[in-house]
Amino acid sequence: MSKVTVLNDKFEKASELDLPAKYAEVNPHNLYLYVKSYLASLRANTAHTKGRSDVSGGGKKPWRQKGRGGARAGSTRTNVWVGGAVAFGPKNNRNYFQKVNKKQKRLALERALEDKAAKNALFSVDSLSIESGKTKDANAVIKKLGLKDVLIVKDLLDEKTLLAFRNLANCYVVDVNEVNAYLVSVFNAVIIEKAALESIVKEG
């Protein structure tokens, strides 16, 4: 059973909190499938080539079939000719969507949290709000924790906190309703508000 490091108001280690034991029993393959699906959904699908039916021209046979001494040809737009079509090239009408059901998404998040806790990279705090909305104040918090590449999960994301962290390259703030297994996995450390963590555990 992995533990969550609980921080006090000064962002110093105060205690530890146990994650539910079932999180450690989740098959890591669920996390793999979710991340694979998530990344597939981000694909821009812009690669596109023209096939024989798409290119212009080439309707007329360039020369007679026999008698010239050269290779026979039926069109100037075959894939072996310069300026011709592309054989079996990519099309931009392809759908990369990969279905992952709700239960699998849930299991993936549980496994991601378990993995972070096992690496001592999952932290909980009562509240993490930057009332001033200043990036300088947000950066001071991150420096005090000595963390790099941090995901911050808030129970209720307020605009001031979002503005404060938005311009920090090594931080990303997200509401608990928008957090997913990919985000938890891709960051080196996760700071989650106590209420947000309780909400995630309760849903499970």
Swiss-Prot record:
<dbReference type="Pfam" id="PF00573">
    <property type="entry name" value="Ribosomal_L4"/>
</dbReference>
<comment type="function">
    <text>Forms part of the polypeptide exit tunnel.</text>
</comment>
<keyword id="KW-0694">RNA-binding</keyword>
<keyword id="KW-0689">Ribosomal protein</keyword>
<keyword id="KW-0699">rRNA-binding</keyword>
<dbReference type="InterPro" id="IPR013005">
    <property type="entry name" value="Ribosomal_uL4-like"/>
</dbReference>
<dbReference type="InterPro" id="IPR002136">
    <property type="entry name" value="Ribosomal_uL4"/>
</dbReference>
<protein>
    <recommendedName>
        <fullName>Large ribosomal subunit protein uL4</fullName>
    </recommendedName>
</protein>
<comment type="function">
    <text>One of the primary rRNA binding proteins, this protein initially binds near the 5'-end of the 23S rRNA. It is important during the early stages of 50S assembly. It makes multiple contacts with different domains of the 23S rRNA in the assembled 50S subunit and ribosome.</text>
</comment>
<dbReference type="GO" id="GO:0005840">
    <property type="term" value="C:ribosome"/>
</dbReference>
<keyword id="KW-0687">Ribonucleoprotein</keyword>
<comment type="similarity">
    <text>Belongs to the universal ribosomal protein uL4 family.</text>
</comment>
<dbReference type="GO" id="GO:1990904">
    <property type="term" value="C:ribonucleoprotein complex"/>
</dbReference>
<comment type="subunit">
    <text>Part of the 50S ribosomal subunit.</text>
</comment>
<dbReference type="GO" id="GO:0003735">
    <property type="term" value="F:structural constituent of ribosome"/>
</dbReference>
<dbReference type="InterPro" id="IPR023574">
    <property type="entry name" value="Ribosomal_uL4_dom_sf"/>
</dbReference>
<dbReference type="GO" id="GO:0019843">
    <property type="term" value="F:rRNA binding"/>
</dbReference>
<dbReference type="GO" id="GO:0006412">
    <property type="term" value="P:translation"/>
</dbReference>
<feature type="region of interest" description="Disordered">
    <location>
        <begin position="49"/>
        <end position="75"/>
    </location>
</feature>
